[in-house]
C-alpha cells in the first residue's frame, strides 16, 4: 500500500435484534471515544451501517485513517486482525476476525 494514501478499513459483526441498540451505543459512546483517548489521532472518520435480518442485525463499519501507520497504531502490527474490545464481544453473536483495507483513491461530494 502507498503510505501517503488515506486508508479505508472495513469490518462486519452481527448481533441480536435486542442487542443492536446496545452495540450501536457502545460503538458511539465507548469504543471509538476510547480509541481517540489512546492517541489514535489518524482515525478521521467512522461510518456505522446496519442491515436488519430476520433474527439478527449486521453491522458494517467503515473507518477512514490518514495513513497505514495510523491503522497500525489502532490495530497493532498485525493490523489485518479485527479490533474487537471484550465488552463488544459480549454482545456480538459473531464477527469477522479480520478487517479489509483499501486505499482511498477519490471521494466525490455530489451535493
Predicted feature residues:
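Intrinsic-disorder/low-complexity regions
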Residues: 1-4, 18, 77
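Residue-level signal for secondary-structure boundary sites
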Residues: 19-21, 69-71, 107
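Glycine-rich beta-strand-turn "strand-cap" elements at beta-sheet edges
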Residues: 1-3, 44-60, 83-111
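Short, surface-exposed ligand-recognition loops at beta-strand->loop->(often short) alpha-helix junctions
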Residues: 14-27
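An amphipathic, aromatic/His-enriched active-site/gating alpha helix that lines ligand/cofactor pockets
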Residues: 30, 34-43, 64-101
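Short, well-ordered beta-strand segments in beta-rich or mixed alpha/beta enzyme
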Residues: 7-14, 45-79
Amino acid at each position: 500500500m502507498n503510505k501517503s494514501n488515506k486508508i479505508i478499513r472495513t469490518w462486519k459483526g452481527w448481533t441480536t435484534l435486542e442487542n443492536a441498540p446496545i452495540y450501536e451505543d457502545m460503538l458511539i459512546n465507548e469504543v471509538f471515544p476510547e480509541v481517540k483517548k489512546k492517541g489514535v489521532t489518524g482515525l478521521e472518520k467512522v461510518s456505522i451501517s446496519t442491515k436488519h435480518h430476520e433474527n439478527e442485525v449486521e453491522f458494517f463499519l467503515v473507518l477512514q485513517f490518514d495513513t497505514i501507520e495510523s491503522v497500525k497504531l489502532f490495530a497493532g502490527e498485525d493490523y489485518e486482525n479485527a479490533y474487537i474490545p471484550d465488552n463488544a464481544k459480549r454482545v456480538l453473536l459473531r464477527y469477522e476476525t479480520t478487517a479489509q483495507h483499501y486505499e482511498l483513491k477519490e471521494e466525490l461530494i455530489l451535493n
